């Protein structure tokens, strides 16, 4: 099958591999992007696909805490200029409060709820669109709860480009919970702990690592031991509690919180626009440059 430039671009963004390597991988896998990622990894050309592989939209993430409840919200705009607008920032905060007030479970349900002034959230967003002059949309939100013996950690990076909400059980040290939220913003783990990783994901990773070791020419009798070591490293990379704490790399996140009497039980990390299609700018010029 013909491999499109768009597909090559997507694989490059996922893996960081070179254009020709990506094209070959897609050709070998009949254009299946997930199989192409594995192909590149097995050849030692690429690391695991990034979690936030395609980021394009602008906007803000906001975290609103109230007692034993907290909400994290992402609202998108078209430009970064609008994301810095005070009116837009106020809208995002207002929507986060509305999430806590209404207990809405979906964006659609939230849009139909009424604000204290009697207007629906949908009306409020449309008014903001008219005033600001850009398309705005509520993309997603999440609510977390805790007890009086626990703590929330809220951290916003780059003024709300990345937002994290953590739930730490057994400790009321909100500063420690915030430090862990900062760690999660920086390192971007997928899970709290290895207990959350599915058996299917572990089996898939084990297969990829085994093929990778065999392709490196390692003797069959030591491959299994190598695979288990690399699998432990992989799990450390994707599980928050096993990672070296950014503020003190000599201890893990789990050890840091344990010293405060707490345990990380949940987190939500939003990065503005993650997973959304990028605008296709300058890729044709890049292709032309490669062909010279």
Curated annotation (Swiss-Prot):
Q: Gene3D superfamilies from the xrefs?
A: 1.10.286.20, DNA helicase RuvA subunit, C-terminal domain, Elongation factor Ts, dimerisation domain
UniProtKB keywords: Cytoplasm, Elongation factor, Protein biosynthesis
Q: Which PROSITE patterns match?
A: EF_TS_1, EF_TS_2
The GO molecular function terms of this record are: translation elongation factor activity
Superkingdom, taxonomy of origin: Bacteria
Which segments carry the region annotation Involved in Mg(2+) ion dislocation from EF-Tu? 79-82
Main location, first listed in the record: cytoplasm
Spell out the subcellular localization from the entry. Answer: Cytoplasm
Q: Which CDD domains match?
A: UBA_EF-Ts
Q: Name one GO cellular component term.
A: cytoplasm
Q: Give a yes or no for keyword Protein biosynthesis in this entry.
A: yes
Family label: Belongs to the EF-Ts family.
Q: What does this protein do?
A: Associates with the EF-Tu.GDP complex and induces the exchange of GDP to GTP. It remains bound to the aminoacyl-tRNA.EF-Tu.GTP complex up to the GTP hydrolysis stage on the ribosome.
What's the protein called, per UniProt?
Elongation factor Ts
């Amino acid at each position: 099958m013909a491999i499109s430039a768009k597909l090559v671009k997507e694989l490059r963004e996922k893996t960081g591999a070179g254009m020709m390597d990506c094209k070959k991988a897609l050709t070998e896998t009949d254009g299946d992007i997930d199989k192409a990622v594995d192909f590149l990894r097995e050849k030692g050309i690429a690391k695991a696909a990034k979690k936030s592989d395609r980021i394009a939209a602008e906007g803000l993430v906001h975290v609103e805490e109230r007692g034993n409840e907290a909400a994290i919200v992402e609202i998108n705009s078209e430009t970064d200029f609008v994301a810095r607008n005070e009116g837009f920032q106020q809208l995002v905060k207002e929507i986060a409060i509305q999430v806590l007030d209404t207990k809405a479970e979906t964006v659609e349900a939230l849009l139909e709820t009424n604000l204290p002034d009697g207007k629906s959230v949908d009306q409020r967003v449309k008014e903001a669109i008219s005033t600001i002059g850009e398309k705005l949309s509520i993309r997603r939100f999440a609510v977390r709860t805790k007890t009086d013996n626990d703590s929330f950690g809220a951290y916003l990076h780059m003024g709300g480009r990345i937002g994290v909400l953590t739930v730490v059980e057994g400790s009321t040290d909100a500063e420690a919970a915030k430090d862990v939220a900062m760690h999660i913003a920086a390192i971007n783990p997928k899970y709290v702990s290895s207990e959350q990783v599915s058996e299917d994901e572990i089996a898939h990773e084990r297969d990829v690592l085994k093929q990778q070791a065999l392709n490196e020419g390692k003797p069959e009798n030591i491959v299994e031991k190598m695979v288990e070591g690399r699998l432990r490293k992989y799990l450390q990379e994707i599980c928050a509690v096993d990672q070296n704490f950014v503020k003190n790399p000599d201890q893990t996140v789990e050890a840091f919180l344990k010293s405060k009497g707490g345990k990380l039980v949940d987190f939500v990390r939003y990065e503005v626009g993650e997973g959304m299609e990028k605008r296709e700018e300058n890729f044709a010029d890049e292709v032309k440059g490669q062909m010279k």
